[in-house]
Design a protein with these regions (language model features):
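A short glycine-rich, Lys/Arg-flanked "PGG" loop and its adjoining helix->strand segment in the class I
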Residues: 104-118
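SAM-dependent methyltransferase
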Residues: 123-190
Length: 224
């Protein structure tokens, strides 16, 4: 799992350090336990970070004490964010949750747009339905990470379609497999087009690894 963690951290670090400039105001949605705080620190940005899981927020806030001059961590998501306008909003491994239903998708994208200045960026890493659905309906990589999906998800591309995910390591999956909504990039691009232009949609890791890393895509949208 160390190799997997390094791959994922490297991909996140590259995006963060490439797309965020010193002095930028950034919102990190789905910050988890604050494992990326040092990556944000390297950019010199002012960071707001949030997560819907209160246990994760508590740990992130403890980690963030040393960064208190430039970092604010709160419980929630973009829908209960303040009136601050950001240079960028990031969703690393968390955007799939706005695909819970049509209302959540639409309201989340609208709120993201309202909190980004014109020309600002909406970016991150997301499990990509186009990379998941070609896999066997129950697929396990050599590290024991497992994904399950049904054929219904292939033929009915819509919000609310779910997969079952179990990572063999990591506190989020400590109690077992978790259902997660599927992110369909065509739906996302279409719904976001009212406010954003797509700049990039590529594999998180360019080479095929045979690991769960292969299901993730990097995305960058620019606010119009």
């Amino acid at each position: 799992m160390d190799k997997l963690r390094k791959l994922h951290n490297s991909a996140k670090r590259e995006m963060i350090t490439t797309l965020v400039n010193k002095g930028d105001i950034v919102l990190d949605v789905g910050c988890g336990r604050g494992g990326d705080l040092h990556k944000w620190a390297a950019t010199g940005c002012f960071l707001f970070a949030c997560d819907p899981d209160i246990e994760s927020v508590n740990e992130a806030q403890n980690r963030g004490l040393q960064y208190s001059e430039w970092c604010r961590i709160f419980h929630g998501d973009v829908l209960n964010f303040s009136d601050v306008i950001c240079d960028a909003i990031c969703y690393n491994f968390s955007l799939q949750y706005i695909f819970k239903d049509n209302q959540t998708l639409r309201s989340s994208l609208k709120s993201i747009a309202e909190h980004i200045k014109p020309g600002g960026l909406f970016f991150g890493v997301v499990p990509d339905a186009n990379r998941i659905l070609p896999l066997p309906e129950k697929w396990t990589d050599k590290l024991g990470n497992t994904i399950e999906h049904g054929s219904f998800c292939k033929n009915n591309r819509k919000t609310g379609n779910m997969i079952i995910v179990k990572m063999s390591d990591g506190p989020y999956y400590k109690n077992g497999a978790i259902p997660e909504p599927l992110c369909y990039n065509d739906i996302l691009i279409n719904e976001a087009s009212e406010w954003f232009e797509l700049q990039a949609w590529t594999k998180m890791i360019p080479e095929t690894t045979g690991l769960i890393s292969d299901i993730y895509s990097k995305f960058i949208f620019r606010r119009v």
